[in-house]
Amino acid sequence: MIDVMQIQEILPHRYPFLLVDKITELKVKEVVRGYKNISISDHVFMGHFPGHPIYPGVLILEGMAQTGGVLAFESMEDKVDPKSKVVYFTGIDGAKFRNPVRPGDRLDYEMSVVKNRGNMWIFKGQAFVDGNLVAEAELKAMIVDK
């Protein structure tokens, strides 16, 4: 498992834009699973939507992207310092939002490698709440020098 303090050593994101709390499983160049606890105190709920809080789909995608970024960094064969590199997401295809995500939910991410060639990655991303699919997409990324 990789906790939030270790995630911050891998990814440049910080509160309020670090959208993965823990990595629960990681198989190099294959799959990563992690989650974010969705809280009513998340700043996004001040405006999305008052009286009917729904976690934005674009933030679900970003959380999947960050989870995939951890997998990409941990799968690098040359093990460079992540502080000298950054993962840029270059494309999102086939994004679908199946069910709303609300405060109190645990948002589980699963990112599977579809293809990897050098610094280029294609992931199949899925997000779940209580085992139910809430979002899915194919995400493309590349690791570049800062």
UniProtKB/Swiss-Prot annotation:
SUPFAM superfamilies reported for this sequence: Thioesterase/thiol ester dehydrase-isomerase
Biological source species: Campylobacter jejuni subsp. doylei (strain ATCC BAA-1458 / RM4099 / 269.97)
Family annotation (Pfam families): FabA (PF07977)
Taxonomic placement: Bacteria, Pseudomonadati, Campylobacterota, Epsilonproteobacteria, Campylobacterales
Keywords recorded for this protein, A-Z: Cytoplasm, Lipid A biosynthesis, Lipid biosynthesis, Lipid metabolism, Lyase
Protein name: 3-hydroxyacyl-[acyl-carrier-protein] dehydratase FabZ
Task of the protein: Involved in unsaturated fatty acids biosynthesis. Catalyzes the dehydration of short chain beta-hydroxyacyl-ACPs and long chain saturated and unsaturated beta-hydroxyacyl-ACPs.
HAMAP family: FabZ
The EC number(s) this enzyme carries: 4.2.1.59
One GO BP: fatty acid biosynthetic process
CDD domains membership: FabZ (cd01288)
MF annotations from Gene Ontology: (3R)-hydroxyacyl-[acyl-carrier-protein] dehydratase activity
A single Gene Ontology CC term: cytoplasm
Family, as annotated: Belongs to the thioester dehydratase family. FabZ subfamily.
